[in-house]
């Protein structure tokens, strides 16, 4: 036996492994239509059965994680469409199928057509996100393409009326089921684009079987949706129903009611937002007024600090301080001179030169006299300046005016009485005199003819 022949010798296990790998690699997944027989379901939950036709049969298994997605329970003798992978059970050398999904034969053929069209349109780019148009926000007018007598239209109108009653709606009635339905749906989409009345379209219908929804898996409908210049929201069936129209549309809604919510504004939410904006504006206004009130208070305080009465009082206080300082300074100088004189006298007494003492005494007396004269002149000057300042202060004092025989009269509101227009007969007045106040009542108001002023008569 040659070396090359020896390398081609297989063991049984190696043969079965090689065949299994070849089948799985070359065949992959396939669609198979057949009749079920020998169906069984052990405690593990897996399904085991035979798929056959009138000439052959093959073993098949469907594991629990796959069969739980099946919407029906298979029966012996039932025609089904199965998507499965081909493999080989190595211990026995039996080749078999591992089913991934299963449908009744009628729906299964439709599903196969669905998958084929889906792959074709996806390859052409009809599902690409780059082609999706954004929905208007907010929509000004909504178009609805569906059956005029279906529950879907009722649901859409009910939601729009609840959320946004003022939103205009245009209905493009069409069949949604049957042989003629796809062409009618296409024409309705084209008509809506031709009229350009709406800025968003809802295309859909209520729930049903795969066959009932088949109009929305039609290639013509898919291309009409793709070519629409108006954004389209698909709303076909229930949330679990998926059609070709859902993939092509600019946005998919799980139900017609959900589509109506997507294209409409929630007026309750808008009112809530407006109320929030109003509350924020009120808070901002309150803050602004509080800031302006504080500013006004500060300005009022500054104005009060500049009042003439306060300024006069401060000047008078300053004058009094200066007077005290002047007097204290003079007294201090006198005390210092007196102490110096005493020291000199003590020194003179110790020396006792009588003549010199007499002369020094005279000089001291003269100096003391001149000093007193100088201090007196300086004090007189300060007194004169102080008297002038007091006279000036007295001249502008309201009390000095009262002392000269004048009076100040106030209205009941507390304002100074300047003209007869401020009062009328029966009003009570308060008059400020030099030594007190007088309360009076007006009995008559007379206007002077020459000066055109009213005369106030009091009692």
Swiss-Prot record:
GO biological process: DNA catabolic process
Enzyme class at the top of the EC tree: hydrolase
Catalytic activity: Exonucleolytic cleavage in either 5'- to 3'- or 3'- to 5'-direction to yield nucleoside 5'-phosphates
CDD domains tied to this protein: ExoVII_LU_OBF
Subcellular location: Cytoplasm
Entry-linked InterPro entries: Exonuc_VII_L, Exonuc_VII_lsu_C, OB-fold_nuc-bd_dom
Superkingdom of the source species: Bacteria
Keyword Lyase among UniProt keywords: no
GO molecular function: exodeoxyribonuclease VII activity; nucleic acid binding
Keyword annotations of the record: Cytoplasm, Exonuclease, Hydrolase, Nuclease
Keyword Nuclease part of the UniProt annotation: yes
Gene Ontology CC terms: cytoplasm; exodeoxyribonuclease VII complex
Enzyme Commission number, as recorded: 3.1.11.6
HAMAP family named among the record's database cross-references: Exonuc_7_L
Subunit note: Heterooligomer composed of large and small subunits.
Alphabetical list of NCBIfam families matching this protein: xseA
Family affiliation: Belongs to the XseA family.
Protein task: Bidirectionally degrades single-stranded DNA into large acid-insoluble oligonucleotides, which are then degraded further into small acid-soluble oligonucleotides.
The protein, known as: Exodeoxyribonuclease 7 large subunit
Record organism: Yersinia pseudotuberculosis serotype O:3 (strain YPIII)
Name of the gene this protein is made from: xseA
């Amino acid at each position: 036996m040659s070396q090359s022949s020896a390398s081609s010798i297989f063991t049984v296990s190696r043969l079965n492994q090689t065949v299994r790998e070849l089948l799985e690699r070359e065949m992959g997944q396939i669609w198979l239509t057949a009749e079920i027989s020998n169906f069984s379901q052990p405690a593990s939950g897996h399904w085991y059965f035979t798929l056959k036709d009138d000439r052959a049969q093959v073993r098949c298994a469907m594991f629990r994680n796959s069969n739980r997605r099946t919407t029906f329970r298979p029966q012996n003798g039932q025609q089904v469409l199965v998507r499965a992978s081909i493999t080989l059970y190595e211990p026995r050398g039996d080749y078999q199928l591992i089913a991934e999904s299963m449908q009744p034969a009628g729906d299964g053929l439709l599903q196969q057509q669905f998958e084929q069209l889906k792959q074709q349109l996806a390859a052409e780019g009809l599902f690409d996100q780059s082609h999706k148009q954004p929905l208007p926000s907010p929509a000004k007018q909504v178009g609805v393409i569906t059956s005029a007598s279906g529950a879907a239209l009722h649901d859409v109108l009910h939601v729009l009326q609840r959320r946004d009653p003022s939103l205009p709606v245009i209905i493009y009635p069409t069949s949604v089921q049957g042989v003629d339905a796809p062409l009618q749906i296409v024409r309705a989409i084209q008509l809506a684009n031709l009229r350009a009345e709406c800025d968003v379209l809802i295309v859909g219908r209520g729930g049903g079987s795969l066959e009932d929804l088949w109009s929305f898996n039609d290639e013509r409908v898919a291309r009409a949706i793709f070519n629409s210049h108006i954004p389209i929201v698909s709303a076909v069936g229930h949330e679990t129903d998926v059609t070709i129209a859902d993939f092509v549309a600019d946005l998919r809604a799980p139900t017609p009611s959900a589509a109506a919510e997507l294209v409409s504004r929630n007026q309750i939410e808008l009112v809530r937002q407006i109320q929030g904006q109003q509350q924020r504006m009120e808070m901002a206004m309150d803050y602004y007024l509080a800031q302006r009130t504080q500013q006004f208070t500060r300005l009022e305080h500054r104005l009060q600090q500049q009042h003439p009465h306060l300024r006069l009082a401060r000047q008078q206080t300053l004058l009094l301080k200066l007077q005290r300082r002047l007097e204290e300074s003079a007294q201090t100088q006198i005390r210092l001179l007196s102490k110096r004189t005493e020291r000199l006298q003590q020194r003179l007494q110790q020396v006792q030169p009588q003549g010199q003492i007499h002369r020094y005494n005279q000089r001291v007396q003269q100096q003391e006299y001149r000093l007193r004269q100088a201090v007196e002149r300086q004090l007189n000057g300060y007194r004169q300046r102080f008297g002038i300042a007091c006279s000036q202060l007295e001249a502008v004092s309201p009390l000095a005016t009262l002392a000269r025989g004048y009076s100040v009269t106030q209205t009941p509101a507390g304002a100074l009485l300047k003209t007869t227009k401020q009062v009328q007969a029966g009003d009570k007045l308060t008059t400020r005199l030099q030594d007190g106040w007088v309360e009076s009542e007006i009995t008559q108001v007379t206007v002077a003819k020459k000066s055109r002023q009213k005369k106030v008569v009091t009692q």
